[in-house]
Curated annotation (Swiss-Prot):
It is found in: Cytoplasm, Cytoskeleton; Cell projection, Cilium. SUPFAM superfamilies: P-loop containing nucleoside triphosphate hydrolases (SSF52540). This is Kinesin-like protein kif7. GO terms for cellular component: cilium; cytoplasm; Hedgehog signaling complex; kinesin complex; microtubule. GO terms for biological process: determination of left/right symmetry; microtubule-based movement; negative regulation of smoothened signaling pathway; photoreceptor cell outer segment organization. InterPro entries: Kinesin-like_fam, Kinesin_motor_CS, Kinesin_motor_dom, Kinesin_motor_dom_sf, P-loop_NTPase. It holds the Pfam family Kinesin. It comes from Danio rerio. Binds microtubules. Interacts with gli1 and sufu. Acts downstream of smo as an intracellular repressor of hedgehog signaling pathway, mainly through the suppression of gli1 activity. This negative regulatory effect is enhanced in conjunction with the suppressor of fused (sufu) protein. Positively regulates gli2a activity by promoting its dissociation from sufu. Involved in the regulation of microtubular dynamics. ATP binds at G94, Q95, T96, G97, S98, G99, K100, T101. The gene is kif7.
Length: 1363
């Protein structure tokens, strides 16, 4: 099925569809023998409650219907409508425990097989399947999940959201919109199922007497889809946007407080649930009752009705599934549910296609047409005025060619028309045409004649069909004017059409670009899809194989085990059927006691063999589980704490296999009764046979909870594999983000490393300036600050010191921030490595789960073969059961006949009181004898227990003896090793003594030169001998004392001796107890032999009436015991069901805990991904700001260089002018000798003053330039030059005379050379290097002491001292 294109929006009126689903009887209801009160007829779509209450609906599903049938018949048409743009709703209604959650599909996904999945998983899978089949559709799918608990909204996908943040609104079209609900965009089925599982764990559920997992809130799972269909893009660029939503509503069950037994918080929840359902019933009644049309609909009385406003009488296609219970105890609730459904069928909805793009396009086109019409009318009026004012001759010339072409075409068409006229006239005259053709020819000829007459009257000429005369000049001019108007209009239309065409071409180019992007994204997606399909191919094959195995007949019907989720399937038929076969009976003699002993021994031995075999099989499972756990621990060592739930969940435990449908004590009482008499043995046989006959009933009771236990492990493993796949994908995306962040951080590192070096250089320069300023400040403080200039200099120095210190602090902070940013790449690399390890561990877990899937599938196949064998055995037992049932019926009939005879007195005699007392005495005597037999059997059992305990003690003793023998052998080996070491040491000592003797001989006969060396060797040999002697003494002591083992081993050996001694005492005590038991049994055996003889003798002397009376007494006793057994069995079954429910609850809680951990991990991964994106954005902004700062710094440097170059050029020009003036002033003049001498002195003084001033001013100028350049570097923008700066700032207009210069130089020279007390001669050379700011130069003054550095500032620093 592929979604069709949608044209204009259409409205479809449809009634609310109603489906009734009857659930099967629950195990507890079967146990208490509840009857079904529902009769359904799917063909006639009718449900009958009781005998005379009939209800018709759209769909009827019996208790044997499957989930696939419900989905295919009811929900699949809604999916098609959902794809066509309609809203849809599926709601489940009914009492608590009627199967609403199971039907809607909100139960645990991993707890059911694929054929048991509900509506939501199937619908979502169908949606994504259709989207995959239609690649041309651009779609987006979002899901939301919320609940209404106690009339308060709660977002299940974001539990932290407060209820006040969720509001119900209506848009401009009247559709209900939920504001504040988290909508997660999904791209596949696995993501939807994961969100459904996480929301399900956060839903409010609780246990009541009717349902252990009762839903305590209404839930709404919504799927929202938007489709962008571009089928008409090529025509007009329009895009259709279809938006539709699908509500899956699981209503809380209606509850009777007396039945549920709710109190406290559960009672408050029940009141809220019932009030909400009451409002829903009122809404359904108001909408479904024809008499109440036009009345108020109470949508706002409840939150759930406000949400379902579209679904009930609004813009949606709605399906209501009424879930009912067939039990007769729920008759009233089923009746209320069916009445609800009956009223809901009368509700009419008006479903509309939700298409946003097409109506907007039509409205826009209509507005555009109106605007174009107005523009055309205005243009025509303006053109008419222009034509009236313009020269007609100039405007007619371009159109004369067109007129000639039109006249030629007109003449051609007239010629063709004349030919056709003549031809049709001839055909009409021949009479070969039929009536219809003649009629059409006449109509055509009449039309031609009318046109000819019209042309003749209009032109005023005799213009027949064959004439081709021209029109007169007046008509031609008029027609040409009209044609001119039309041509102008055409030109305007052509211009507008070209504009519109250019717009369309731009849109087409944009769409083509988008299409190219989409194709690239599609190729990437297809590549990823291929990779994922390759990875999951093996898993799909395995799932298909499991499905085929599950589809086989008889698939796990006999697995009645109570086990927790994720446990390995274990066959419940591992027991041998010997427990159900009665012992062979006999009717005579001494063989009775022998049969009792043999029967007891056979029964106990079979039980022990059975227990041993079951234990062996269970141990095998335990060993396999331990092996799997060891493998898992090896693979998951790094994530053990994080994934502890997985290890706990997968722990396989030994399961106690019951010996019958209700455990090992099922046939204990009948067996004890069957030992006193052959007739009692027959009752024993009947009891066992009846229990076998009832096994089918008990299996049906047990089958609901444990029918598919072997499949749960597989399903949950598949669910875990899906969850791991999603988590792995999220981690891989996070790794990509981290890698991208690392690359950006590396790029930033390179930039910041350069910036760090720049900042370090700047900080170093600032430190140097700070040091210089501090030195200058100290010098000024030493001088004492006698004048105002020194004080101002000191203050300036302090300000500069403070500025330099703050600058150093700022630079240090920048350096720290930059280093912190530079460390981002290292952090990203560490996180990438950690995430890669996590992903690797997850992949190992996934491989481990896949291996477990394969192992469990193999184990399942083995169990199925064993089940087949068990089935054959059950068939044999059923055949034997039928035979024994026949015998039982015969005996029962005989007893009934005897009772009738006794009541009717047909035997001719009435039992007297004495005879009754005699029968009672005989009964008591038989009871006493039976107690003796029971004591004998208990003694046999105790003896067997003592023998078993003695065997266990012997086994422990053997183990201890083996361990002690190991230690003793170790001790013996140690003693042998010590003896060998002693022998080696002794031989070594003897060899050393021989060497010493030889060396002493050499020493006496040797020369003086060799004596020193020999003495050294002799001393070494003696030291070695002493060391060996000490070692031999130690070994002798150890061997003499027996210290051959370590202290721990000695202590262990001592403890073993004590334990063996204790076990010997225990074995001796057990032997004595066993001997005493055997003596007692032998004595009781002789007594039993005597009792047998007495019993047979007394039974022989009994009359027929006494025998029958005694038999009736024992029959009544057996019946009462059977009734008691029945009650105990029912109590046991209820306890087993309760235990199974608790185990399911524990499994559900474990799954919820694991889900919460998984959600926390995913939420953390998502937050990390968002954090990495934010980091990337910050890095990008930092890079942009750095680029902008570098560009601004570059512009600033360029402006500074430009200004300095201008200043340099100006200084060069000023220098040249001053040199020229100086040469003019010092030119050749006629002077006397004194004048020349004075002039030479003045010149020398002036030159010296100028040189000294230049030397003093130069460091000040350099410092000022450095300080100014730094200030400009700190400014973010390029500061322009001061407005007072001019090129003519040199003293050109105030020209100094030679006398003034001479006077100024004479004044400045002594001022500059005055040495104050306490100052050295280099004061100015040190002080002038301070970058102080000098006051602006005032105009020429008379006093000489006003400006000591007047000449330097006026000549050099033109920007600070403009004229």
């Amino acid at each position: 099925m592929s979604p069709k294109g949608v044209g204009h929006s259409k409205v479809e009126e449809s009634a609310v569809q109603v489906a009734v689903r009857v659930r099967p009887l629950l195990p507890k209801e079967i146990l208490h023998s509840h009857e079904s009160c529902i009769t359904s007829d799917p063909e006639e779509r009718r449900v009958t409650l009781g005998n005379d209450r009939h209800f018709h609906c759209d769909f009827v599903f019996e208790d044997g219907s499957t989930q696939e049938e419900v989905y295919t018949n009811c929900v699949q048409p809604l999916i098609e409508a959902f794809f066509h743009g309609f809203n849809a709703t599926v709601s489940a209604y009914g009492q608590t425990g009627s199967g609403k959650t199971y039907t809607i599909g909100e139960a645990s996904i991993s707890a059911f097989r694929d054929d048991e999945q509900g509506i939501i998983p199937r619908a979502v899978a169908e949606i994504f399947k259709l989207l995959d089949e239609n690649d041309l559709i651009d779609f987006s799918v979002r899901v939301s999940y919320m609940e209404v608990y106690k009339e308060v909204f709660r977002d299940l996908l974001e539990v932290e959201t407060a209820s006040k943040d969720i509001h119900i609104r209506e848009d401009e079209r009247g559709n209900v919109v939920l504001c504040g609900v988290k909508e997660c965009e999904v791209e596949g089925l696995d993501e939807v199922l994961s969100l459904l599982e996480s929301g399900k764990t956060a839903r409010h559920t609780g246990a009541t007497q009717m349902n252990p997992h009762s839903s305590r809130s209404h839930t709404i799972f919504t799927v929202l889809m938007e489709q962008r269909r571009g089928g008409s893009r090529a025509a007009n660029g329009s895009v259709q946007i279809l938006s539709s939503k699908f509500h899956f509503v699981d209503l809380a069950g209606s509850e009777r407080i007396l039945k549920t037994g709710n109190t406290g918080e559960r009672l408050k929840e029940s009141i809220q649930i019932n009030s909400g359902l009451l409002v829903l019933g009122n809404v359904i009644g108001a909408l479904g009752d024809p008499k109440r049309k036009g009345t108020h609909i109470p949508y706002r009385d409840s939150k759930i009705t406000r949400i379902l406003k579209d679904s009930l009488g609004g813009n949606a296609k709605t399906l209501m599934i009424a879930c009912i219970s067939p039990s007769s105890s729920d008759f009233d609730e089923s009746l209320n549910t069916l009445n609800y459904a009956k009223r809901a069928r009368n509700i009419q909805n008006r479903a509309t296609v939700n298409c946003r793009g097409e109506p907007d396009r039509i409205e826009g086109l209509e507005l555009q047409i109106k605007a174009l019409r107005r523009a055309l009318e205005n243009r025509q009026r303006s053109e008419t005025r222009i034509i009236a004012r313009s020269d007609p001759e100039k405007r007619l010339r371009p159109f004369e060619v067109d007129v000639r072409k039109l006249q030629a075409e007109s003449a051609h068409y007239r010629t063709c028309t004349d030919s056709a006229y003549r031809l049709l006239t001839e055909l009409q005259g021949e009479g070969t045409l039929n009536a219809g053709q003649i009629l059409r020819v006449k109509e055509w000829l009449c039309g031609v004649e009318e046109e000819r007459s019209g042309l003749t009257s209009a032109s005023g000429l005799d213009s027949g069909i064959e004439s081709s005369s021209t029109e007169d000049s007046t008509a031609l001019k008029r027609r040409q004017a009209v044609l001119n108007n039309q041509d102008l209009v055409k030109e305007d239309w052509r211009g507008e059409r070209e504009d519109y065409t250019s717009q369309l071409q731009a849109q087409i180019q944009q769409l083509e670009q988008e299409n190219t992007d989409f194709l690239v994204a599609l190729e990437d997606a297809m590549e990823q899809y291929k990779q994922q399909s390759d990875k999951l191919q093996e898993q799909q094959d395995l799932i298909a194989e499991l499905h085929s195995l599950l589809a086989q007949p008889g698939g796990a019907g006999f697995l009645h085990l109570k086990q927790r989720p994720h446990t390995a399937p274990i066959n419940s038929l591992l027991q041998t059927p010997d427990r159900l076969t009665p012992p062979c009976d006999s009717d005579v003699g001494r063989s009775l006691a022998r049969q009792l002993d043999v029967g007891a021994s056979v029964d106990s031995s079979s039980y022990s063999e059975q227990t041993q075999w079951d234990g062996t099989h269970g141990n095998t499972h335990c060993e396999s589980s331990r092996k799997l756990n060891r493998d898992e621990d090896g693979h998951m060592q790094t994530t053990r704490d994080k994934r502890k739930s997985i290890n706990v969940t997968w722990t396989k435990k030994d399961i106690a296999i019951p010996q019958g449908p209700f455990g090992g004590t099922r046939t204990a009482l009948p067996q004890t009764l069957g030992l006193c008499h052959p007739l009692g043995m027959q009752f024993n046989r009947r009891t066992s046979n009846s229990s076998i006959g009832e096994s089918s009933v008990w299996e049906s009771v047990r089958g609901f909870g444990g029918e598919f236990c072997s499949d749960r492990g597989l399903l949950q493993a598949q669910q875990k594999i899906r969850e791991l796949s999603i988590t792995i994908r999220m981690k891989e995306e996070l790794i990509k983000e981290l890698v991208k962040t690392g690359k950006d951080a590396q790029a930033m590192n390179r930039q910041y490393s350069r910036k760090i070096s720049e900042l370090e250089a700047e900080a170093e320069q600032a430190r140097v300036e700070l040091t210089e300023a501090q030195k200058q400040l100290q010098e000024l403080e030493v001088q004492g600050g006698r004048d105002a200039v020194d004080r101002s200099k000191a203050q300036e120095c302090r300000r500069k010191i403070a500025a330099a210190q703050s600058k150093v602090q700022v630079l240090k902070q920048k350096q720290r921030d930059t280093a912190q940013l530079a460390s981002l790449s290292a952090q990203s690399e560490r996180r990438v490595q950690e995430l890669e390890r996590n992903v690797q561990n997850m992949k190992q877990q996934q491989d481990l789960l896949q291996r477990r899937l394969r192992e469990e599938s193999q184990q399942k196949r083995r169990l199925e073969t064993e089940m087949q064998k068990g089935k054959h055995r059950v068939k044999e037992l059923e055949i034997k059961n039928e035979q024994q049932q026949k015998i039982l019926r015969i005996k029962t009939e005989e007893i009934a006949a005897f009772q009738r005879q006794r009541r009717s007195g047909s035997n001719g005699s009435v039992v007297s009181l004495e005879e009754q007392q005699k029968i009672e005495e005989q009964k008591r005597w038989l009871d006493e004898e039976m107690e003796k037999v029971l004591d004998q059997r208990r003694g046999l059992e105790d003896l067997e227990g003592e023998l078993t305990k003695r065997e266990e003690i012997l086994a422990k003793k053997e183990a201890l003896l083996w361990e002690r023998s190991g230690l003793e052998s170790k001790k013996l080996r140690s003693s042998q090793a010590l003896s060998q070491d002693l022998l080696t040491l002794s031989s070594r000592i003897e060899s050393l003594e021989r060497e010493l003797t030889e060396r002493n001989g050499l020493l006496r006969s040797g020369s003086a030169q060799d004596s020193q060396q020999i003495r050294q060797e002799i001393s070494n040999l003696r030291q070695e001998k002493e060391l060996l002697l000490k070692q031999r003494v130690e070994l002798d002591d150890k061997l003499r004392q027996g210290n051959l083992l370590s202290p721990e081993e000695e202590r262990t050996l001592f403890q073993l001796d004590e334990a063996i001694e204790a076990l010997d005492a225990a074995i001796e005590y057990k032997n004595e107890a066993i001997t005493q038991r055997q003596r007692q049994l032998r004595a009781s055996g002789s007594m039993l032999t005597q009792w047998e003889m007495n019993l047979m003798a007394k039974l022989t002397y009994l009359s027929a009436s006494e025998t029958r009376a005694l038999l009736c007494k024992y029959f009544d006793k057996v019946v009462s015991l059977r009734e008691e057994e029945r009650r105990l069995q029912m109590a046991l079954a209820e306890l087993e069901l309760r235990v199974e429910e608790q185990q399911n609850l524990v499994g559900w809680l474990e799954a919820a805990l694991e889900r919460q951990q998984l959600e926390a991990d995913r939420r953390l991964t998502q937050q990390q991904k968002e954090h990495e994106r934010n980091i990337q954005l910050l890095l990008q902004q930092c890079r942009e700001q750095m680029d902008e700062g570098l560009a601004g710094r570059l512009r600033q440097y360029e402006g500074l260089i430009h200004n300095l170059s201008k200043e340099l050029n100006f200084c060069k020009i000023a220098n040249q002018e001053l040199n020229i003036k100086l040469r003019e002033m010092c030119g050749p003049v006629n002077l006397t000798g004194e004048q020349c001498k004075g002039l030479n002195c003045d010149s020398l003084l002036l030159a010296g003053a100028q040189s000294r001033v230049a030397e003093d001013v130069k460091p000040i100028i350099d410092a000022e330039r450095v300080q100014k350049s730094r200030e400009e570097m700190r400014e973010p923008v390029n500061a322009p030059l001061p407005a007072t700066w001019r090129r003519s700032s040199l003293p050109t207009e105030d020209q100094y005379t030679m006398e003034e210069l001479r006077q100024r130089a004479a004044c400045e020279l002594p001022n500059n050379r005055i040495v104050q007390p306490g100052m050295n001669s280099t004061h100015w050379s040190g002080s002038t290097s301070l970058p102080v700011t000098r006051p602006r130069r005032e105009p020429r003054r008379s006093s000489l002491n006003t400006a000591p550095l007047y000449s330097s500032s006026a000549i050099i620093d033109v920007r600070r001292n403009p004229v």
